[in-house]
């Protein structure tokens, strides 16, 4: 089953932005195991899970397992994941996912996470906001603003700031999404290449995605 951790999901039809966040890319994607959901009240829920280590969708060759949980209340969710961090494991991650209806046309989504792997002395942390404005029944525009940083003991953090502006036009089962994305790494990190093949700290991109659901 798909992960309970994070604001964004694997299916592009369910995400507002077409490209995915750093928070999504560095968390778990899917799990093989069992989970139990409990409705504590009309507005409060609890989920507990025992799975193979993250993204191990077959037999756990290491013989290890992972634990997970989710507490939901009034549309806000606190998510937990833990494995030992060995054999390529993720370690410990705590994640908050939620959102608020500012008015009938404006929604504000929020995601924040912290990860630590004691085996590799590494991890990450970050936060993202997702304001989304519906301008008509067929069209909406949304922004993702994200701050994310990789961590490694003994080294400076590697932070990145990202902005993604997405339009979403829906016609029956078809969604058209034009999108502009800007990524900028800080602390003199230059992971990208410009048009001349020279290392640079920033990247701008544009795409138009067509998503058909059936």
Model-based region annotation:
Residues 1-72, 78-82:
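Surface-exposed coil loops of outer-membrane beta-barrel proteins
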Residues 73-80, 86-214:
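Outer-membrane beta-barrel pore domains
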